[in-house]
Structures are given as C-alpha cells and as structure tokens.
Amino acid sequence: MSFMKEFREFAMRGNVVDLAVGVIIGAAFGRIVSSLVADIIMPPLGLLLGGVDFKQFHFVLRAAEGNIPAVVMNYGSFIQSVFDFVIVALAIFSAVKLMNKLRREKAEEPAAPPAPTTEEKLLAEIRDLLKAQQQK
C-alpha cells in the first residue's frame, strides 16, 4: 500500500474529519467569545466601575529608560482572558450537559421485545394444546 493511499485513508476516516471540523468551529467560537467579552461585556462593566478600561490595568515592573521599553505586567488583559475562559467553559458545559441528557433519554426508552421465533410460536401452540387436553 502506497504512502499516499494510506494517508488518504487515514485522513478520510470519520474521526479525523470530525476532529478537524471541531477544531475549526472551536477556533471560530473562540474569536466570537473574545469579541463578546472585549466589545460587549467589559465596556459596560468598566463603566459600572467608574469608567475603567480593563486593558489598561497593569503594573510597571521597570520604567522605560531611553530606548528600552517599560516592563509591565498586564493583569487587565489577564482578567479579560479569564472572562473568555469562563464563558467558553459555560458554553461547553451546557452543550455536554444537554448531550448527556439526550443520550440518557434515548437510553431510557425501552427496547421493543423481540418477536418470538418460529420455534417459540410452535412451542406455545403445543403448550396451549396440552393445557386444553388436560382440562377436558
């Protein structure tokens, strides 16, 4: 089997394709959540806290000197990243919880009893005939 044929079979397996789709959708969802946090949630939150822009929160570890830029710890960006994570985690938790609920409901549906085989039908008829003879 040639290398390209093996690779094609590997790449076209359902799990690999599903994983690729999941990664692409996850990346797009991450950008949407980042925009939601940065552009929708944080501005009103900053306004409620007195017009604060969280991106500007930082500690100066070393001031700028000449051509050397300042060394800062941007904890405001970290706060935004934490909000991003919490929203993504809630969305994933909700999706998994819904999937588990649907899976449980599907599993709880009782399976239809199997239809009796021909042998079972014949045995039931013989049993019924024997019972009828004993009652006479």
Swiss-Prot record:
Localization annotation: Cell inner membrane
Keywords assigned by UniProt, alphabetized: Cell inner membrane, Cell membrane, Ion channel, Ion transport, Membrane, Transmembrane, Transmembrane helix, Transport
Entry-linked NCBIfam families: mscL (TIGR00220), PRK00567.1-1 (NF001841), PRK00567.1-4 (NF001843)
Family membership: Belongs to the MscL family.
Quaternary organization: Homopentamer.
Family annotation (PANTHER family): LARGE-CONDUCTANCE MECHANOSENSITIVE CHANNEL (PTHR30266:SF2), MECHANOSENSITIVE CHANNEL MSCL (PTHR30266)
Function: Channel that opens in response to stretch forces in the membrane lipid bilayer. May participate in the regulation of osmotic pressure changes within the cell.
Entry protein name: Large-conductance mechanosensitive channel
